[in-house]
């Protein structure tokens, strides 16, 4: 949250250089705070658990947040009752005329399919295209990040030699970026994926900045310079037990998964998993809400539409 000081205080310039939100008396007098409106497109199979994980991270700031959950109407869900979706989720047709301060698109267990083979791909493209004119800042997670990069910039994905699964140390490459305010030089980051976005193609997109990397996982977090688009290739939202559950699921399906790296004490899957990324996850989501969403959107909600529009992309060629 902002710090109010007397204009001219010698420390102001240095604080602002460190991405500390400092305001003078005049701005403080006119400071108004309204609830932020967020849309979460939950593509994960265990929706109730993912809902809880996302909401926990969104609740760590003093900001009031109104959250809508969206489901893909073109997909038949196997793990979530329709009654739950009818009660707590909305379809795209119900919200397409609304404007949102922020959008979160989760991962999905479909990365081994080609994008066009996913049964809700056309609907996904429609949502991404709509977000350019109806959402101020969008945050994409894992498959959601890979798919959005493909939709917007034609960045393809490539298969990894084996599933990347575990907790990996990522290096902060741009410590002055507001999304990493308060971070140490390194942070732990859960990964669970079979594919990655093509690094050489990412480098060709001039508006994208690589914010964090890992020797083992490659690029881990990207963002547009104006923070209107943020791409997380891992799962900061995961709780302590998520990777353990996925590991057991894969074993039961006969996939013979490797043990998640840097996760179980002494690599013993009978032990309680180690939680080493909670503080980084909380800080990152708080920074996104504060710097990418709250500080950029207007106080008057009805003016949000004027702030959302950006350049258009040709999405039709992907359908």
UniProtKB/Swiss-Prot annotation:
Subcellular location: Cytoplasm
Broad class of enzyme this protein falls into: transferase
Positions of the record's site feature: Important for substrate specificity: 192
A matching Pfam family: HTS
EC number(s) given by UniProt: 2.3.1.31
4Fe-4S listed as a keyword: no
Binding site for substrate: 163, 192, 249
Active site: 142 (acyl-thioester intermediate), 235 (proton acceptor), 237
Pathway: Amino-acid biosynthesis; L-methionine biosynthesis via de novo pathway; O-acetyl-L-homoserine from L-homoserine: step 1/1
Record-annotated site: Important for acyl-CoA specificity: 111
Catalysed reactions, as listed in the record: L-homoserine + acetyl-CoA = O-acetyl-L-homoserine + CoA
One GO cellular component term noted in the UniProt record for this chain: cytoplasm
Family as reported in the entry's similarity comment: Belongs to the MetA family.
Function: Transfers an acetyl group from acetyl-CoA to L-homoserine, forming acetyl-L-homoserine.
Protein name as annotated: Homoserine O-acetyltransferase
Gene name of the record: metAA
